[in-house]
Amino acid sequence: MLLGQVVALVVLVLGTAALGVWWSARQGAVRAPRQAPAGIDWASAGIALADRVTFVQFSAEVCAACRSTSRVLGGLTGSSSGVGHRELLVDDHLDLVRSLGVLRTPTVLVVDGGGREVARMSGVVSDTQARQALNRVPTAAAEADGEGQS
């Protein structure tokens, strides 16, 4: 009886550890965009897009990961021309949240100058992950790399 309980406990611990590793690996990972609904009009939603690429961040008022992600994206957009960052509270944009399939905060959509979603990230985003997402938009990536090396 005791051996069975020990085996069950070991299986539970290993399963929990595997779940933790999987969860950590997904934090901020750059993924391909979901199939965006046709004809999203960002301007009518009150979102002014930057010339080349915009990080559209969906946040919640009480979200430490959102503040951290906002600092990372703000730093990147401040050093790159044509790159913008718009932070939206999910409570104020429920229609967009539903239509874009935003399931957690922070969720960051990488939107090109034409309004198309190029990449998507969920969870805390590092500077490296943000630059990786920026690389999905070739003209913005070249601009950011050139300015970062000056």
Describe the residue ranges of each PLM region.
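Thioredoxin-like thiol-disulfide oxidoreductase module
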Residues: 85-104, 114, 127-138
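N-terminal targeting signals for export/organelle localization
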Residues: 1-39, 150
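Non-catalytic, surface beta->alpha helical segment in thiol-disulfide oxidoreductase systems
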Residues: 110-150
